[in-house]
């Protein structure tokens, strides 16, 4: 199973630690370098970290080559837009996105979207994507 994570935020480490044993290939894409995150995960053999200034332009390829996608940037508009764009490219891709604003999180949660948030995070909110 190929898992892709788009964005490095406070949730990325937590999610990565919980999914690391479920995949032989985890690719993490960020538009800027996070040296603390990179150094912490340098020795993990199944994790690759890519800096890509044009993530939005390469989203089609990422969506089509991933079995599971996590949109975990600190930008709620980017996460929501990318999630919906990915559904257009590949409707069968399993994905979840982060909403850091409580109102946005609750709005999407009420509409039954696959959304997670740092202030109300449960492993069950995203691990079902990998265990299916």
Question: Which role fits each region the language model picked out?
Answer:
Residues 1-132:
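Cytosolic regulatory regions of ion transport systems
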């Amino acid at each position: 199973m190929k898992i892709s994570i788009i964005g490095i935020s406070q949730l990325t480490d937590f999610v990565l630690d919980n999914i690391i044993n479920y995949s032989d290939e985890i690719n993490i894409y960020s538009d800027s370098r996070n040296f603390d995150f990179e150094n912490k995960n340098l020795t993990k053999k199944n994790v690759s970290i890519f800096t890509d200034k044009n993530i939005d332009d390469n989203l089609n390829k990422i969506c089509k080559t991933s079995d599971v996608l996590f949109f975990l940037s600190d930008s709620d508009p980017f996460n929501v837009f990318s999630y919906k764009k990915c559904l257009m490219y590949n409707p069968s891709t399993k994905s979840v996105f982060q909403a850091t604003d409580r109102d946005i999180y609750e709005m999407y949660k009420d509409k039954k979207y696959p959304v997670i948030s740092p202030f109300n995070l449960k492993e069950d909110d995203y691990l079902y994507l990998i265990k299916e």
